[in-house]
């Protein structure tokens, strides 16, 4: 199996949506061989500090191994003509470092934002205006993290109407060092596809592509279930949307 990590994940901080604790998510991802996971709670970043701290604690052991091994390796590499025994030590230390680096787990900080259909300042008496399109936003680095928390803060102080909403004006202003994914069936592009508005969906793809370039991704989901208690209407819609997403991805 190709290396894989989850970039759209809700924790217990996504009220009435997520259920998994951050500890459980980190443990499950690690046991499944994943070297990273994103946390993208709905409209909030309440769990990010806990997530970051717990991953740092998990990484402390392999980081200690790397530090000690590199310290022991340095004088050996400085020798112009190491003995056979020293060469064996070098090889063993390098393997130890590589193994420890492979055990490092990466926390990806993000949020599933609600993006206003019009403006974050718009407060029309419609259900559409009270929610907003779903949009996955991930921080590439510290600057991206700062831009993300700025947008999320403004979604509460300026854009709250039913839900905390960002808008495309904020995306244009704070887009640097962010990765954006088109999200689930609640995203703008999937919704336009389901409404039969493929031209509008393509216009939206081009808007995001122009702003984020190679840091913009079309997200595909395929959640088939035969559980009689589950919502079995989701999967057929995902299949319908995925077909068009593949076409748009190949085209753009």
Positions of predicted regions on the chain:
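Phosphodiester-processing cores and adjacent nucleic acid-binding clamps
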Residues: 1-252
């Amino acid at each position: 199996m190709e290396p894989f990590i989850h970039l759209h994940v809700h924790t217990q901080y996504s009220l009435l949506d997520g259920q998994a604790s951050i500890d459980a998510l980190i443990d499950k991802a690690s046991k499944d061989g994943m070297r990273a996971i994103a946390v993208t709670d709905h409209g909030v970043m309440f769990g990010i500090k806990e997530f970051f701290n717990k991953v740092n604690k998990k990484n402390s052991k392999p980081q200690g191994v790397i530090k000690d091994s590199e310290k022991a390796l340095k004088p050996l590499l400085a020798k112009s003509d190491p003995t056979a025994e020293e060469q064996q030590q070098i090889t063993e230390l390098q393997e130890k470092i590589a193994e420890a680096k492979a055990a490092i787990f990466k926390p990806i900080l993000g949020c599933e934002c609600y993006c206003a259909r019009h403006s974050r300042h718009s407060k029309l008496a419609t259900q559409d205006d009270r929610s907003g399109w779903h949009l996955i936003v991930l921080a590439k680095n510290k600057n991206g993290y700062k831009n993300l928390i700025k947008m999320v803060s403004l979604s509460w102080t300026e854009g709250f109407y039913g839900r905390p909403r960002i808008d495309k004006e904020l995306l244009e202003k704070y887009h640097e060092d962010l990765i954006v994914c088109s999200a689930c069936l609640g995203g703008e592009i999937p919704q336009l596809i389901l409404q039969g508005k493929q031209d509008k969906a393509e216009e939206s793809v081009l808007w995001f592509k122009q702003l984020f370039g190679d840091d913009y991704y079309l997200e595909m989901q395929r959640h088939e279930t035969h559980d009689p208690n589950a919502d079995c209407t989701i999967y057929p819609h995902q299949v319908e949307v995925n077909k068009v997403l593949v076409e748009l991805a190949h085209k753009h």
